[in-house]
């Protein structure tokens, strides 16, 4: 598959500033693209579609790059755009969030079987993960499925590392409680 090239930021800035902003954009996208592709692939279950979603995210980010640099956390802004693009793609392709999450986690769990050996598919772990509150879901997936470091997750979520650790801990507790409840029902 041929990858589209990213446009250069269009600026009304002096050439030196424009060049710096171009370099910052390109460096940011190059360093972020592998994670964006993996995250999108995780949700839609198809790497090629994940790449298209990630590139669309880069194009959208490019449109607001100056504003993002001036006012916001680029990692958080990019993650927001990426998640919006995933939702749009799922709607366009008639894939429900639960179905995409289930397929994605099934693939991710198989790939990291040893890490998740204690979780049994029959106990509805995929459903439980997909039903976590948004912030817990994001932190859990980034850490345990995609293997991101705490500092990287904190930048993407625009929170402290302590908040990331706490959020992941809360997600684990919620999952354990859900799985325990299902076990009692069986």
Where are these regions (language model features)?
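Σ70-family region 2.3-2.4 aromatic/basic alpha-helix that recognizes the −10 promoter
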Residues: 51-64, 70-106, 172
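A short, charge-rich alpha-helical start-of-domain segment used by transcription regulators
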Residues: 3-8, 12-38, 48-51, 62
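DNA-recognition helix of helix-turn-helix
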Residues: 83, 151, 157-186
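Short, small-hydrophobic-rich alpha-helical interface motif
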Residues: 36, 40, 50-61, 153, ...
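A short pre-motif secondary-structure segment
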Residues: 139-143
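C-terminal flanking helix
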Residues: 33, 58, 133, 137, ...
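Acidic, proline/glycine-rich intrinsically disordered inter-domain spacer in sigma factors
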Residues: 15, 100-130
